[in-house]
């Protein structure tokens, strides 16, 4: 199962690196200046930073795991983006 979210932000690269570094202390994570991948027990998150957009793709084996992965990515991104309180992360299933 797969879902994706495209988040408008001028700080996509910074947030992508923060997410990868943060989770990299607990689970396997790799990244470069534009892309990252985090491998959780419940699935995998792929990230891509563009100049004005952070794209996230979540993959998991079942709906419950996918929902957990979306929630984890959403909550941590919003924590790092606290200066953007109106940030909306809308996941699209199957996208």
Feature roles, as predicted:
Residues 1, 46, 93-95:
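Eukaryotic, polar/proline-rich low-complexity intrinsically disordered regions
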Residues 1-10, 15-18:
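Short glycine-/aliphatic-rich beta-strand segments at the starts of folded cytosolic domains
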Residues 2, 33-37, 51-55:
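A generic structural signal for beta-strand entry/edge sites
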Residues 8-11, 30-32, 48, 71, ...:
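Charged, terminal alpha-helix-loop-beta segments
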Residues 25-42:
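Ser/Thr-rich, low-complexity intrinsically disordered terminal regions
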Residues 41, 45-60:
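Beta-strand/loop substructures that line and gate deep hydrophobic ligand-binding cavities in soluble
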Residues 58-95:
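C-terminal structural segments of small proteins and small subunits
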């Amino acid at each position: 199962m797969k879902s994706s979210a495209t988040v408008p932000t001028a700080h996509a690269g910074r947030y992508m690196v923060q997410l990868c570094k943060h989770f990299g202390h607990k689970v396997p994570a790799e990244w470069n200046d534009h892309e990252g991948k985090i491998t959780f027990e419940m699935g995998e998150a792929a990230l891509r930073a563009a100049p004005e957009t952070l794209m996230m793709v979540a993959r998991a084996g079942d709906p419950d795991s996918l929902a957990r992965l979306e929630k984890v990515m959403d909550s941590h991104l919003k924590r790092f983006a606290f200066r953007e309180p109106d940030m909306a992360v809308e996941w699209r299933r199957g996208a």
